[in-house]
């Protein structure tokens, strides 16, 4: 049974801590690690393990670090439990994802990318959207975990496709943000109040996550 298996979260910042707490509150056998010692001081409920032990003992490892460049440097350093699963929740380059997968597959370790959208609020409330580079059947045993941390989970079939989807997602978000900046400047040049602009957009077809959450 999955709840009897050791699950670990590497990276306990705002996103990772939210994910850890979701699983901790449902009584999973969960451990954590973060390079920042203050995380341990300020979160006494977290069961900490050093990286060597996490890789040695864990059945499932959730990686919530800045990018998979950090992951590649770490996995070459430690021996990883055979038949364990690494779920990469970072926003990363797909070619690096494929490189990591090729390395780990030779060691009988499964690795999948599962990029996140929803921010720290989504991690805390379990309402993330996950973009997964795998077939759904490959992660059936972890459905309970995925359902606890995400409201929407999409499977794209092959390793790297989850991270590719996140890059497309971010490109749209950043593009809309830049356009909103330009439109805001143009509105001010036309003597239109920025607050009025955003209020109008948010109740019309021009509304977006960016206009609702990032402006003014």
Describe each PLM feature range.
Residues 35-36, 67, 135:
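Residues in the short beta-alpha loop(s) of Rossmann-like NAD(P)-binding domains
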Residues 161-216:
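Helical "substrate-binding/catalytic lid" subdomain
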Residues 30, 48, 110-112, 153, ...:
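Hydrophobic beta-strand scaffold residues
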Residues 1-56, 60, 83, 120-123:
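NAD(P)+-binding Rossmann beta1-loop-alpha1 motif at the extreme N-terminus of oxidoreductases
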Residues 51-80, 85-95:
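Rossmann-like NAD(P)-binding element
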Residues 91-171:
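Rossmann-fold dinucleotide-binding core
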